[in-house]
C-alpha cells in the first residue's frame, strides 16, 4: 500500500544523530491504558491512527501554537498533555521540520515553572523581532482552580541554536494582566505582533459581559511593557473569542503571502468561537489611525465565513519567508468517546498545513494543501471521461485507498434536474445537509464515497448537492457536504454531517473536489479550495485494504468523471511514531 517511511534525507539523518537518546523521553515512558472490553477492537487498531497527519506518538494534543521559520527549520509548538490522552497538564510541545511534512519531536519548550504560569501554559504565538530573534507570547494561568489568565513572554536561551531547544522567561513576566472590569477567566491567546509607527501591537482574545467577544489591542515600544488601548480592535455579540489571528493579504487572486507587519489594504480577522467550537473569519479594512478593524460585509460578524466547515478549531497562521506564503494550521479533535481515547492512548491531530490567499472576488480566502504534501504521493490510478448514470456508482480500483489523495473533476449534464431550495433552511448549510444527506435521492447530488466497505455497510460521503437558482439571473446554489452518518458500525461515536455553501458558478456543470483520506480523517477541498471540510471517522470494517473508493450519483442527471487521479500516500517521519 506504500505506507513505508520515505528514505531519510541528509538533514533528517543529521538531526537524528544530534538528538539520539534525547527525543521522546516523555513519550516513551507512557503506555496506553488497557482497552476496556466495551471498546471495539477496531477503535484501538493501529490502522485507525493517521498515517500522514501531524500528531505525537501518544497522548492528547490540541491547539497549534507559535509556528515559525528560523535558521532553516520550521518550528511547530502545540498544546500537549505528557501524562495522558485527555486534556490537562498542558505544556508547549515542540517539533521541527524542513518541509512541514516530516517532523521530529524535541523536548517541550514551555512548561509551568514560574509564578505567572504555574497552573498552565496555554496558547499563544511567535513573533520574529527586527534582529531576527523569535519571541513567544503565551497565556499563563497563575491561580489555582479559577483559570486566572495573564500574558507572558519567552525568548530562546541560545539564539544561535537553529532548533531553539531551550527557552527562558524574563523575570518581568507577566507582560499583560487583566485590569479591573475585565473578565480574567476569558483573557487569552495573544497573536503574532506587528510593528508600525514605532510600536508593536498584539491582540488578546476576550469576553465582555455575557456575549461580547472582542480582540483586545495592546501596544509596546520595547516588546516588554505592554499597554492596552482604550478600545478593542474589533468586537461583536458572538460570545468569547479564543485564538484570535490577524494578518494582511495580497491583492485578490495573488497567492503570495505577506509578513504580519507589512501594511495592506485588506486584512483577515479570525477568531475561534468558544460557543460553537468553530473558526470564523472576516475580510476587511484596518484603519491604522483609529486602530479599528471594519469587515467589508457589515453583517459579516454574524454571518461569517469559516476556514473549515467541519472539525477544525484553534487555528493559527504564519508567514513562511522561504516560499513567501501564508500557512494555516488547525486542530481536529476526536469524534469518539473519552473512554475510547484512553484505550487508544492518544487524541487529537492537526490538519494538513494549507496555503491561504484572497480569492479573485476579494470576498473570501482560498485554501489548498501545501505543495510539499505531494512528495508523499506513490502509486496512482487515473480515470477519464467515465459517465456515472443516475442511481449508480463507480469503484476506483488499482490502489489502496485508506491512505490516499484524490483529485477529481466532475461534470453534470442536467442542471435542470436540480431541486428548488427550501427557504426554510435559510443559509443553514449544516441543517440542510442533515435533511438532504448523501442517500437522499433525486435532483442533482454526486460525489465520493470514501473509506467504504465492500458491501457499503460503511461509507463516508463527500459530495455536492445543487439547487435551482433563487431568482432570475442568479447562479445555481451549490452545497458541499461530508456525511459520516454511515461511516462506522461502532457504537458511541459522534457522527455529525458537516456542510458549507460553495460560492462558485456551476452553470457550466463543472466542479472539482480534492479529498485527503487518512485512515480516521477525511479532509476535503471543494471548487479549488473555496469550501473545506474536515471530518473524523472510525470505520470498523473499511480499514486497511478493506477500504474502498467510489464515485456515486444519487441524482437524476448523468455525471461525468472528466478526470480523476488518486494516489496512495506514503508515511512521513512523524515525531518518532
Swiss-Prot record:
Reaction catalysis annotation: Hydrolysis of terminal non-reducing beta-D-fructofuranoside residues in beta-D-fructofuranosides
Location in the cell: Secreted, Extracellular space, Apoplast; Secreted, Cell wall
Enzyme Commission number(s) of this protein: 3.2.1.26
Pfam family, one: Glyco_hydro_32N
Gene Ontology CC: apoplast
Residues bearing attached sugar chains per UniProt: 158, 183, 333
Keywords carried by this UniProt record: Apoplast, Cell wall, Glycoprotein, Glycosidase, Hydrolase, Secreted, Signal
Leader sequence residues: 1-22
Annotated InterPro entries: ConA-like_dom_sf, Fructan_Metab_Enzymes, Glyco_hydro_32, Glyco_hydro_32_AS, Glyco_hydro_32_C, Glyco_hydro_32_N, Glyco_hydro_beta-prop_sf
GO BP field: carbohydrate metabolic process
Enzyme type, top EC level: hydrolase
PROSITE patterns in the cross-refs: GLYCOSYL_HYDROL_F32
Residue numbers annotated as active site: 63
Keyword Nucleus: no
Residue ranges the record marks as coiled coil: none
GO MF annotations, alphabetized: beta-fructofuranosidase activity
Biological function: May play a role in sucrose partitioning during seed development and in stress response.
Family: Belongs to the glycosyl hydrolase 32 family.
Protein name: Beta-fructofuranosidase, insoluble isoenzyme 1
Source organism (scientific name): Oryza sativa subsp. indica (Rice)
Gene, per the UniProt record: CIN1
Amino acid at each position: 500500500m506504500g505506507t513505508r517511511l520515505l528514505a531519510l534525507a541528509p538533514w533528517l539523518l543529521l538531526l537524528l544523530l544530534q538528538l539520539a537518546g534525547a527525543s521522546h523521553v516523555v513519550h516513551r515512558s507512557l503506555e496506553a491504558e488497557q482497552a476496556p472490553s466495551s471498546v471495539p477492537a477496531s477503535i484501538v487498531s493501529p490502522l485507525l491512527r493517521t498515517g500522514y497527519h501531524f500528531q505525537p506518538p501518544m497522548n492528547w494534543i490540541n491547539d497549534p501554537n507559535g509556528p515559525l521559520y528560523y535558521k532553516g527549520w520550521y518550528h511547530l509548538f502545540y498544546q500537549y498533555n505528557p501524562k495522558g490522552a485527555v486534556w490537562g497538564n498542558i505544556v508547549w510541545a515542540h517539533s521541527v521540520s524542513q518541509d512541514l511534512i516530516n517532523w521530529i519531536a524535541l523536548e517541550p519548550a514551555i512548561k509551568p515553572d514560574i509564578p505567572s504560569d504555574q497552573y498552565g501554559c496555554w496558547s499563544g504565538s511567535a513573533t520574529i523581532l527586527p534582529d531576527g530573534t523569535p519571541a513567544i507570547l503565551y497565556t499563563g494561568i497563575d491561580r489555582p482552580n479559577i483559570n486566572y489568565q495573564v500574558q507572558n513572554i519567552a525568548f530562546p536561551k541560545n539564539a544561535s541554536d537553529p532548533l531553539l531547544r531551550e527557552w527562558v522567561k524574563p523575570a518581568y513576566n507577566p507582560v499583560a494582566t487583566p485590569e479591573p472590569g475585565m473578565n480574567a477567566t476569558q483573557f487569552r491567546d495573544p497573536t503574532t505582533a506587528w510593528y508600525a509607527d514605532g510600536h508593536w501591537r498584539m491582540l488578546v482574545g476576550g469576553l465582555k459581559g455575557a456575549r461580547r467577544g472582542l480582540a483586545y489591542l495592546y501596544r509596546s515600544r520595547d516588546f516588554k511593557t505592554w499597554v492596552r488601548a482604550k478600545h478593542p480592535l474589533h468586537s461583536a455579540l458572538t460570545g468569547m473569542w479564543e485564538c484570535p489571528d490577524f494578518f494582511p493579504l495580497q491583492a485578490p487572486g495573488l497567492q503570495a503571502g505577506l509578513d504580519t507587519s507589512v501594511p495592506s489594504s485588506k486584512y483577515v480577522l479570525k477568531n475561534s468561537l468558544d460557543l460553537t467550537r468553530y473558526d470564523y473569519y472576516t475580510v476587511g479594512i484596518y484603519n491604522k489611525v483609529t486602530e479599528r478593524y471594519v469587515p467589508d460585509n457589515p453583517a459579516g460578524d454574524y454571518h461569517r465565513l469559516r476556514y473549515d466547515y467541519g472539525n477544525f478549531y484553534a487555528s493559527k497562521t504564519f508567514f513562511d519567508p522561504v516560499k513567501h506564503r501564508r500557512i494555516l494550521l488547525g486542530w481536529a479533535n476526536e469524534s469518539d468517546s473519552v473512554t475510547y481515547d484512553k484505550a487508544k492512548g492518544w487524541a487529537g491531530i492537526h490538519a494538513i498545513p494549507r496555503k491561504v490567499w484572497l480569492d479573485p472576488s476579494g470576498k473570501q480566502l482560498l485554501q489548498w494543501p501545501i505543495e510539499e504534501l505531494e512528495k508523499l504521493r506513490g502509486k496512482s490510478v487515473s480515470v477519464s471521461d467515465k459517465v456515472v448514470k443516475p442511481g449508480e456508482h463507480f469503484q476506483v480500483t488499482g490502489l489502496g485507498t485508506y491512505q490516499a489523495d484524490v483529485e477529481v473533476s466532475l461534470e453534470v449534464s442536467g442542471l435542470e434536474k436540480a431541486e428548488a431550495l427550501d427557504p426554510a433552511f435559510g443559509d443553514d448549510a449544516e441543517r440542510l445537509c442533515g435533511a438532504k444527506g448523501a442517500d437522499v435521492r433525486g435532483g442533482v447530488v454526486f460525489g465520493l464515497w470514501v473509506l467504504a466497505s465492500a458491501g457499503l455497510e460503511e461509507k463516508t460521503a463527500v459530495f455536492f448537492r445543487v439547487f435551482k437558482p433563487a431568482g432570475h439571473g442568479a447562479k445555481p446554489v451549490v452545497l458541499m457536504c461530508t456525511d459520516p452518518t454511515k461511516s462506522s458500525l461502532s457504537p458511541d461515536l459522534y457522527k455529525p454531517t458537516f456542510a458549507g455553501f460553495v460560492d462558485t458558478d456551476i452553470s457550466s456543470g463543472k466542479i472539482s473536489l480534492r479529498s485527503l483520506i487518512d485512515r480516521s480523517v477525511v479532509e476535503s477541498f471543494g471548487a479549488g479550495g473555496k469550501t473545506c471540510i474536515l471530518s473524523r471517522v472510525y470505520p470498523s470494517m473499511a480499514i486497511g485494504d478493506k477500504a474502498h473508493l467510489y464515485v456515486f450519483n444519487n441524482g437524476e442527471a448523468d455525471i461525468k468523471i472528466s478526470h480523476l487521479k488518486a494516489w496512495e500516500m506514503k508515511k512521513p517521519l512523524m515525531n518518532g511514531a
